[in-house]
Amino acid sequence: MTDKAISLQAAQQVEAAIERVGTRKMILVTHIVTHPAFVVPTPHRIFDFFNAYIGTKDFNYIYDSYNIQYSIMGHVHFRKTLTEKSVHYLCPCLGYQRQWRTDNISQEINHALMDFTI
């Protein structure tokens, strides 16, 4: 099975699970990046190549079709938030210690934590 086929299959499996939830407000949690604003900014000496493997657009129709309030994703090891079309996209990654801005684990964890209401 190709990477593209696996990605599409994952989106279809998520959609099937969402169908069982019904019309309730939802939080979609994925490891992969599901919004292009969350890939690593280029040019980047390493990620110019790897961005192709970090995320997918196969979830786009899910955000357009279902009551997704929050989308929490990871994989890129940086922290970012974005609100678009009433969906709050969150990337609260802790990352590797070498990627932290400080040497204080408590400070880094507290910076990565996010509160939200659904």
Predicted regions: what is each one?
Residues 1-49:
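Active-site-proximal loop/helix segment associated with metal-binding centers of metalloenzymes
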Residues 13, 75-76:
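Generic detector of contiguous secondary-structure segments
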Residues 27, 70-71:
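Hydrophobic "anchor" residues on beta-strands that sit immediately upstream
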Residues 30, 73-74:
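Short His-Asn-centered micro-motif
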Residues 40-52, 56-69, 76-118:
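Binuclear metal-dependent phosphoesterase catalytic core
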